[in-house]
Amino acid sequence: MEIKEEYSIELEKKVQEKWEDEKTFKFLDDEKRPPYIIDTPPPYPTGRMHLGHGLNWTYMDIIARFKRMNGYDVLFPQGWDCHGLPTEVKVEELNNITKSDIDRHEFRRLCVELTDENVEKMRGQVRSLGISIDWDREYITMNPDYVRKSQTAFLKMYEKGLIYRGKHPVNWCPRCETAIAFAEVEYQGRTSKLNYIKFPYAENSGKYLEIATSRPELMAACVGIVVHPEDERYSDVVGKTVKVPLFDQEVNVYPDSDVEKEFGTGVVMVCTFGDKTDVTWVNRHKLEVKKAINEKGQLTEICGKYAGKKSDDARKEIISDLISENYMIKQEPLEQNVGSCWRCKTPIEIIVGDQWFVNVTKLLTEVENAANEISWVPEHMKARLMKWIEDMGWDWCISRQRLFATPIPVWYCKDCGEIIVAKPEDLPIDPTKESPYTCKCGNSNLVAETDVLDTWMDSSITPLVIAGWLEDEEFFKKHYPVQLRPQGHDIIRTWAFYTMVRSLAITGEKPWDEIVINGMVFGEDGFKMSKSRGNVVEPGEITKTYGADALRLWASNSTIGKDVPFAWKEVEYGGRFLRKIWNACKFAKMNISDETISELKSLNSISIENPVDLWILSKLNNLISKVSDDLGNYKINTVVEIQKFLWHEFCDNYIEMVKHRLYNKEESESAQQEKLMAQYTLYKVITESVKLLTPFTPHFAEIVGEIYEIDDLHTSWPVSDERLISLENEFVGEVVKNTVASIRRYKSNKGMPLNAELNKVEMYVSDEKDFNAVSKASEDVKKSLKIKELEINLGKPSLEQKISEVTPNKSKIGPEFKKDAGKVMAFIKEADADTIEKMLSEGIETEFGILNKEHIKEVKRAIYNKGEIVETADIDSLIDTIAIIQ
């Protein structure tokens, strides 16, 4: 098969079409091969992949391809995590509506329509990166069958008492107007004011307690005061009653060891609900529950004249009133970490209301045990999950006040308040559309649950769904737990944790054997990519110019678990590397016919004797061994070793050293055998190296694989031939490589063509081992460098540096010697080297007078060997080795 002149990234599209047409990556459930199932992260379908997706999918694909080539039956699906607020916001924006303007089911239809469009766009983007997905195994979380599984998982956990409905404080986003889980709260630094306020004693003694708070707008919901029982300043105030300024309710003072004595005044007001600690104190001291802030982030009617105002506006007015009524003692700057919604970054409130929860606290020990059974890559990432488990204070709030999500399959009896859950056989079901049940009290007039499930309730069952849960019981038993979960470190406390909770609750088993954690992508400026910083690079920008394989090489030159800075120069290097190797493959193919390839396939490499061939084959097999070990341990940046070997050892050196054998037209048996061995070695290095590159640059590998008739490119990983690994062979090869490279550099420095002939080269090698190595490969050295006569000597040469030419200083000699000037210049030109050296150092007495260095304009020196002028080249890395070139 002919090879094109230039490598073109346009070929990548044809390769992708071939894979899809031939279903190259289909999971076969082959009994003869062990399964390897990947719990692929389902991205949110925005319609555009970002570079973080490109990094993560490249990691996954490298692992999938490596496992497939090592004999595994790989199930690598693609999923889409469809539900969520961003789609609702986008639908409102595109249609110039709000979700309250139209019927909820029509609004959901618009969300589904937009999501379908975005999924189709992103399918193409995943394909464009050459990801070896089995598209027959695609799952979409908004599709009816997936909703059925998500609702079934809800029912199973409800039946086990692991899901409950209760009135409970929740993290609430006033911008999104929905509850959010503890794991969805992000903390941001903010400078605010710490307000020192007088709380007068109820007995009107004129005395007061001094309380420090950053949220005076919550004072209407103040239901108690707490002090540390060991704080001597307040030993006499426990049990007393104080009045809340501006709002006048009376509250008691309680002792509590959770109070930080050093913060503020050491006196804390307890509100329902300011933060998590308030929740703890309200429950511990059995205090009244008051609601000061509503779902829109506005103050409620208990706040009197401040009711209806946004929290920030109310705070300003209340502070102003506290000052004017002489309750404010002082204000100090306060640095805080404020909880914010992970999507819109709005500061959260804690409000109380009826919500659905997963009782995660019941499962924490099981999750911890499972985490210890799972292999973590890198290992230290497990600590993040363990820390999350340790800090877990609340159950997981799973109900959301939105529309585009999996419906909670529940109704409420209007008469007795009974909760009625759907039957498994009726799933999927939307209770706002259907009400097929009657309460046990006889009432059929049921109220539908309008809240929906948190989207993590969908994505946290992915390993179950991928392994065939609720589809094929035998398949599921055989394939669950799955082998691998790849994901980012930013969602360990959400996706990883929730998946473990759900899997353990439903099956009692861990979800996967291993979890591989990748980092995030940063811009060239060192900051996280964001539109506001202007440092975003999209995968399409890269692939359009450099191709998918260049992007994949950039991603591969990183360490799993660490954040990755993007750099255009690395992408450009990847493109140059592919062109370099393409040219090497093209050169080799010009010297290896299709008929010769068939012959080479049957040759045994052990019959090779040429030291240069043995050197590169030893290097190759060492490389195979290292790359195999590295990929087995998820060290994907081992691609650097492949690149160094191919570029520097193979292209820059080996090919140059075997050209003379490939070009040899001699018909002798020995010459033809040498040529065949060179062809075999070229073929072997190219085909084995292409296989090594397949997980990293699959398009390039596919194209070269077709040219070189590699039939098992996707199913066979190279095996290192230990017989060919030899330190001695590598030593000999390195000596030859350095000798050839040094003399080639000599030619280049002299402005000579690299293929210029050299009449004679004498090598003097001081080290006996080096001498034997060069001698062993003398023919390759001689013919690679086009040396007519090569002499290799053990020892050091008798070299002398002497003056070879001298130019008299006419401007000095003329005026000084006048009519004898010509004779003086002739004398200087004809003088021997010793005479000139003496003139230069101390001057000499002549018949014309004293001559010294001022009478010489220029001196040229040369190296002499055996009385002849020669040139020399030092041989890199060889001990006291020099080549004398004539």
UniProtKB/Swiss-Prot annotation:
Motif ('HIGH' region): 43-53
Cell compartment(s), UniProt: Cytoplasm
Family annotation (CDD domains): Anticodon_Ia_Val, ValRS_core
Coiled-coil region list: none
A GO-annotated cellular component: cytosol
Any single GO BP term: valyl-tRNA aminoacylation
One example GO MF annotation: ATP binding
Pfam families per the UniProt record, alphabetical: Anticodon_1, tRNA-synt_1
Broad EC category: ligase
Keyword field: Aminoacyl-tRNA synthetase, ATP-binding, Cytoplasm, Ligase, Nucleotide-binding, Protein biosynthesis
Keyword Protein biosynthesis: yes
EC number: 6.1.1.9
Binding residues for ATP: K531
Reactions catalysed, as given in the entry: tRNA(Val) + L-valine + ATP = L-valyl-tRNA(Val) + AMP + diphosphate
NCBIfam families xref list: PRK13208.1, valS
PANTHER family xref list: VALINE--TRNA LIGASE, CHLOROPLASTIC_MITOCHONDRIAL 2, VALYL-TRNA SYNTHETASES
HAMAP family named in the record: Val_tRNA_synth_type2
Function comment: Catalyzes the attachment of valine to tRNA(Val). As ValRS can inadvertently accommodate and process structurally similar amino acids such as threonine, to avoid such errors, it has a 'posttransfer' editing activity that hydrolyzes mischarged Thr-tRNA(Val) in a tRNA-dependent manner.
Swiss-Prot/TrEMBL domain comment: ValRS has two distinct active sites: one for aminoacylation and one for editing. The misactivated threonine is translocated from the active site to the editing site.
Family: Belongs to the class-I aminoacyl-tRNA synthetase family. ValS type 2 subfamily.
UniProt-recorded name of the protein: Valine--tRNA ligase
